[in-house]
From Swiss-Prot:
Family the UniProt entry places it in: Belongs to the UPF0260 family.
InterPro entries associated with the record: Puta_zinc/iron-chelating_dom (IPR005358), UCP006173 (IPR008228)
Ranges in coiled-coil conformation: none
Name this polypeptide is given: UPF0260 protein NTHI1811
Domain of life the protein comes from: Bacteria
Length: 154
């Protein structure tokens, strides 16, 4: 997440996702860390179900929702996913609260989003962070940590 100091005010309302600079794109991230929690897919084709877990990437600080080594994450965690302007349509599993997903779907940012609230603490204060996260290295059975199921997975 970038500082708002160098960004145009309300850029997300005046620019499309494709028109945004790299700094603007990064600033859209609210820092909830939900994309860094593991997902589990069960079934095939129309019977596929996506399960969200409270199992976090080993780099994620589960208290703050921030990556412990953001600049090197792709080198350290081989399955770390890079969300870009071009591959965003493939990320239908992003949480309903994700700014990238919201803007892609033509929706507005929530009041607690740091770009709206002006506070980097608003995500935590709004109770958006996943509670009782556990690192992947500490997990044996993923099924014990399922927290939600998305029935709309395609």
């Amino acid at each position: 997440m970038q500082s708002n100091m160098q960004l145009e005010p309300n850029f997300w309302q005046t620019k499309s996702l494709l028109e945004m600079t790299e700094s603007e794109w990064e600033a859209l991230c609210d820092g909830c860390g939900k994309c860094c929690y593991r997902k589990y897919i069960q079934g095939r084709s129309k019977r596929q179900k996506l399960y969200y877990t409270r199992i976090a990437c080993n780099l994620l600080d589960v208290e703050t929702g921030k990556c412990g080594n953001y600049s090197e994450r792709f080198n350290i965690e081989t399955d770390c996913t890079k969300l870009t302007k071009k591959n965003l349509p493939d990320f239908h599993w992003l949480p309903d609260t994700c700014a990238y997903r919201l803007l892609y779907e033509g929706k507005t940012l929530p009041e607690w989003h740091p770009l709206i609230s002006g506070s980097p603490h608003s995500v935590k204060n709004a109770d958006i962070l996943i509670k009782n996260g556990i690192h992947e290295r500490d997990v044996i059975d993923w099924f014990e940590f399922i927290i939600d199921e998305d029935h709309t997975f395609k």
